[in-house]
């Protein structure tokens, strides 16, 4: 653990985590559903950081967001999310109501940036210079970047001080073309010239580790400052590993 993370664990001040959402909400699926932020990726990690006493800030490059329609109907969390998102006084809804614009935030204020998935990432992150600049400056502070599923492409489109992608020569995981087939979106992605993170990572020299199983099991890879999860079921685990790294405990 580096000095920055040790200090966060020892101080009485709450460590701060930034949830960085993609800002796209619009058409994607063949059946007419829109994509955006995966609500499961957001909610599962939010619970972990909140329960461990982190100060949570939510932002996107534009200050806008929308939830992926299909993720909001995920049967694994539908009952819980219905109660959460119908309550304007819950902590998550209050944070979302006050979502910040990324260019108004200081990267050095945070010890973790957590990026939830959703196919909106493929529309947003390859072109969002504000996101790329923020992540570059945050990475230089030695903070931890957590990314899940489609969000991992942000690591491929952000360069470090050497001009290489953040994930070049790093062990990472994320969605593969098999996952896109499983999700029924491969034809859509081909039509839009979108690529899976696995394809992108291998083409820029990342050390991509494919998950042995989709859906059922989480699959998490840590390498230095990068904590990546292969799928939505990895969101909770990625957040927990980042908490352990910052607070230096084995719980």
UniProtKB/Swiss-Prot annotation:
Recorded GO MF terms: glyoxalase III activity
Localization of this protein: Cytoplasm; Nucleus
Family statement: Belongs to the peptidase C56 family. HSP31-like subfamily.
Entry EC no(s): 4.2.1.130
Gene Ontology cellular-component annotations: cytoplasm; cytosol; nucleus
GO biological process: cellular detoxification; methylglyoxal catabolic process to D-lactate via S-lactoyl-glutathione
InterPro entries: Class_I_gatase-like, DJ-1/PfpI, Prot/Nucl_acid_deglycase
SUPFAM superfamilies per record: Class I glutamine amidotransferase-like (SSF52317)
Annotated source species: Schizosaccharomyces pombe (strain 972 / ATCC 24843)
Catalytic reaction list: methylglyoxal + H2O = (R)-lactate + H(+)
TM ranges: none
Main location: cytoplasm
Gene3D superfamilies for the chain: 3.40.50.880
Keywords in alphabetical order: Cytoplasm, Lyase, Nucleus, Stress response
Protein name, entry field: Putative glutathione-independent glyoxalase hsp3105
Origin superkingdom: Eukaryota
Record function comment: May catalyze the conversion of methylglyoxal (MG) to D-lactate in a single glutathione (GSH)-independent step. May play a role in detoxifying endogenously produced glyoxals. Involved in protection against reactive oxygen species (ROS).
